[in-house]
Amino acid sequence: SSTETPPSYNQLNYNENLLRFFNSKPVTAPVELDPPKVESSYVSSARGEDARSTLSPVQGFEGSGGSGSSGNFTTGSNLHMSSVTNTSNAGTGTSGTGNSGDGGGGGGADGTGSGAAPPVTLTESLLNKHNDEMEKFMLKKHRESRGRSGEKNKKSANEAMKMLEYSGPGPGHGHGIKRGGSHSWEGEANKPKQQLTLNPSGGGGGMPLLLDITHTSSSTQNKGLAGVGVGGAGGGVGGGGSGTGLGGNGNVGSGNGNNNQASTNQYTQSGLPCTQNINLWPPFSVGITTPTSVLSSHTAVAQSSFSPQHSLFPTFYYIPASIAASSPSGTNPSPNRPHKHAHVHSSSEKPSTSQAAAATMPLQYMTGVMYPHPSLFYTHPAAAAATAMV
């Protein structure tokens, strides 16, 4: 009796099966042989095995190949005992034939070896001893099977822990796996924005590409845009006016487009480094779109002299209602406003081109409406005038 759970139902029924068999007193024995003689022959065969191999009957029976698992103990023992009674029924009645019958039931190997064992009467002490041996044997097998399963569970748990260690978060996987060419917001949030300052001695003027709208006047922005070639596009406000959504403005600004092309050619001939280290918002690695992929209404803006890095988030310009009346005009505020850079204009530059285009072509901007614009570099003169008047 142990606190461990028994491995099978047959272990619980083993003693019960033995008692049930001996209490049934099978009628197969002949009349001249009394049933105790049959029982003594069975016990003599069992004790003969015990004396020869120091194993209990079912243990020896299992070792000789009768039943390989504990689940077959009861059926094996029943077959074993019925074979003994049948051989006794054959009329031989000796312990030798009983053993041969036992060998037949147990695999045929044990019949000849234990024929010389003396018959032992079946007593209660022998049965108790046999039961104790079988209980120890069963518990030993049960512990072994549990030990094997426990080792397997430990191994599987260790393997799972190793897999977790191998695939766990390493030093580079703290915030998830990043894509190859992307830049996170963390690393570049505090970096200064690099402005591309142009040479003031060039023919296109010294306006930086990243325009500071709040500190520049509308007239200087128009001139700077016409010279830089970012706004050489701006030189054609007719072409730039196509940003308002008017379909025919591309054709209207074609005359100014020639001036734009001349200004951009002049800009490229001056040898100014246009596409230097441009590091602008946002910090995502946005692919540099070629100028041909820009909207057709803004082809005057994106000339071949530079390749803009378009923003993921479009820039919105808001024109208040109070300034909308003066927004198309190219009025010059007081010249005391601070400018970021000195502007040197060449003789071939026409600073009045964008103003004339803005005056000849009325811009249909609605007051109080947000207008998106696809480029970071190009600022519409109407929006520039509105912000300059503030």
UniProtKB/Swiss-Prot annotation:
GO terms for molecular function: transcription cis-regulatory region binding; transcription corepressor binding. Its main location: nucleus. Signal peptide: none annotated. Residues 27-120, 164-188, 247-266, 327-356 are annotated as: Disordered. GO terms for biological process: circadian regulation of gene expression; entrainment of circadian clock by photoperiod; negative regulation of transcription by RNA polymerase II. Residues 93-114, 247-256 have a biased composition (Gly residues). GO terms for cellular component: nucleus; perinuclear region of cytoplasm. InterPro entries: Period_circadian_regulator (IPR050760). Phosphorylated with a circadian rhythmicity, probably by the double-time protein (dbt). Phosphorylation could be implicated in the stability of per monomer and in the formation of heterodimer per-tim. Keywords: Biological rhythms, Cytoplasm, Nucleus, Phosphoprotein, Repeat. It is found in: Nucleus; Cytoplasm, Perinuclear region. It comes from the Eukaryota. Essential for biological clock functions. Determines the period length of circadian and ultradian rhythms; an increase in PER dosage leads to shortened circadian rhythms and a decrease leads to lengthened circadian rhythms. Essential for the circadian rhythmicity of locomotor activity, eclosion behavior, and for the rhythmic component of the male courtship song that originates in the thoracic nervous system. The biological cycle depends on the rhythmic formation and nuclear localization of the TIM-PER complex. Light induces the degradation of TIM, which promotes elimination of PER. Forms a heterodimer with timeless (TIM); the complex then translocates into the nucleus. This is Period circadian protein. It comes from Drosophila tropicalis (Fruit fly).
